[in-house]
Amino acid sequence: MIRLPLLKRPRRNRKSAAVRSIIQETQLCSSDLIWPIFLKDGSGIREEIKSMPGVYRWSLDMVSKELERLCTIGLKAVILFPVIDANKKEQFGSYASHPYNIVCKGIQAIKKSFPELCVISDIALDPFTTSGHDGIFHNNYVINDESVRVYGGIAVMHAEMGADIVAPSDMMDGRVKHIREQMDQMGFVNTGILSYSAKYASALYGPFRDALSSHLQSGDKRTYQMDPANVQEALLECQLDEEEGADMVMIKPAGFYLDVIVKARENTHLPVVAYQVSGEFSMIMAACLHGWLNKESVIKESLLAIKRAGATAIISYATPWVLEWLAKDALPFERSVL
């Protein structure tokens, strides 16, 4: 047998699963994951979203059953998105400020049944407006300051309902500062802010808009969401949000923007949350459903890459499956009787 005179053989550290596990640099844990939930008024609802295989719109009674199951296998956090009936939408998205909308009811119900679960509420107007824009849309433009004023009121209301963290996703200037001031004035000094700091004007949001039945009627979101070509701008947005009082920053999307996650991690001491968005998820699922990729392997790898880039936590539609896989992986090795 030929033996080369090699002093360095990196393969020695890959020779078995046990050896590989003790030197693994990045590990995916259940506490890394945040489950995004689409909530809908009604009962007995579990509607699969056609463009997002395996993802559902839920009524509160049905999602409570799923949460009970997922909490037993390690779920720590959820983020809530509302599916609003068309007859409740109008130009200004006023129903977003209604204390009995599905987000408010969802926060209250989930915190009552699962008090240890971290509940994050999305702050934006696009599910509630007829325009499909994230703010007040007038003369083909989203009005910044008036929209920010509305977000402050919504954030206070969500805090009153029991949200642990509010997450403004609108990309308006100054909204973190205004929300922090409004919540502090009302006594909600311990309610956190997860700011969508670098939210890109990506082509990957289509399935999400299908899920919410929220589509742009005119214009586009490039006047407030970020240019996919830019990274220094993302660092500026993260810096401004940190200065305004954000407790966490977010990069969205995640998989196409790993370089942004890396730089954000290098430039802030705040937690960096990454959002594996609907388009990323649906592309992976399309390949899996065609038999081209292994679902468990590719989803785990996609999330591991995001964490390796520097993400503290990851919002992913695959969270329920990943929790199951991680629970399975954690089972003890079978041992032979000595």
From Swiss-Prot:
Pathway terms, separated by semicolons: Porphyrin-containing compound metabolism; protoporphyrin-IX biosynthesis; coproporphyrinogen-III from 5-aminolevulinate: step 1/4
Metal-binding is among the record's keywords: yes
GO molecular function (one): porphobilinogen synthase activity
GO cellular component, one term: cytosol
The protein's enzyme class: lyase
GO biological process, one term: heme biosynthetic process
Catalytic reaction equation(s): 2 5-aminolevulinate = porphobilinogen + 2 H2O + H(+)
Top-level taxon in the UniProt lineage: Bacteria
Residues involved in 5-aminolevulinate 1 binding: R209, K221
Signal peptide: none
InterPro entries named in the record: ALAD (IPR001731), ALAD_AS (IPR030656), Aldolase_TIM (IPR013785)
Binding residues for Mg(2+): E237
PROSITE patterns per UniProt: D_ALA_DEHYDRATASE
Known function: Catalyzes an early step in the biosynthesis of tetrapyrroles. Binds two molecules of 5-aminolevulinate per subunit, each at a distinct site, and catalyzes their condensation to form porphobilinogen.
UniProt xrefs under NCBIfam families: PRK09283.1
Protein name: Delta-aminolevulinic acid dehydratase
